[in-house]
C-alpha cells in the first residue's frame, strides 16, 4: 500500500479513467459542481463520503480534483490514510481540466 498520493496532469487523469476505470472525485462546492464538472465525476463531500466508500473499491485508482489542484492534495492524502491503494491529485484542478479540453458536463 502506498503511503502517499501522486500528482498527475489532467491528461494523465483522463488516461487513467479511460484505460483503468479510475474514479474521478470532484471535491468542489455543490454550486460549482452543479454548474460544470468533469464527465462522470463523483461529487465527493462529507455527506457523500459513505456512498463513495460503498461504490469505490480500495484497489481501484481514485483521482481527486478541486478548483486549482491545491486542496485536492489534502483529500488525496486522507484517502491514502483510509486505505485506498492508488490515489492521485490533478495538477491544475478543474481549471486545468477545462483548459486541456477534456470532457465536461455543464448546466448551461
UniProtKB/Swiss-Prot annotation:
Domain Rhodanese: 18-106
CDD domains xref list: GlpE_ST (cd01444)
Any single Pfam family the record assigns to this protein: Rhodanese
Location of the protein in the cell: Cytoplasm
Molecular function via GO: thiosulfate-cyanide sulfurtransferase activity
Alphabetical UniProt keywords: Cytoplasm, Transferase
The protein's role, per its UniProt record: Transferase that catalyzes the transfer of sulfur from thiosulfate to thiophilic acceptors such as cyanide or dithiols. May function in a CysM-independent thiosulfate assimilation pathway by catalyzing the conversion of thiosulfate to sulfite, which can then be used for L-cysteine biosynthesis.
Protein name per the record: Thiosulfate sulfurtransferase GlpE
Organism: Actinobacillus pleuropneumoniae serotype 7 (strain AP76)
Amino acid at each position: 500500500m502506498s503511503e502517499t498520493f501522486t500528482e498527475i496532469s489532467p491528461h494523465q487523469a483522463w488516461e487513467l479513467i479511460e484505460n483503468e476505470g479510475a474514479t474521478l472525485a470532484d471535491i468542489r462546492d455543490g454550486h460549482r459542481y452543479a454548474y460544470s464538472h468533469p464527465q462522470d465525476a463523483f461529487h465527493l463531500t462529507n455527506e457523500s463520503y459513505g456512498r463513495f466508500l460503498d461504490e469505490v473499491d480500495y484497489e481501484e485508482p481514485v483521482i481527486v480534483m478541486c478548483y486549482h489542484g491545491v486542496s485536492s492534495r489534502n483529500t488525496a492524502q486522507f484517502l491514502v490514510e483510509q486505505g485506498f491503494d492508488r490515489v492521485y491529485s490533478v495538477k491544475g484542478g478543474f481549471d486545468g481540466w477545462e483548459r486541456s479540453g477534456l470532457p465536461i458536463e455543464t448546466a448551461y
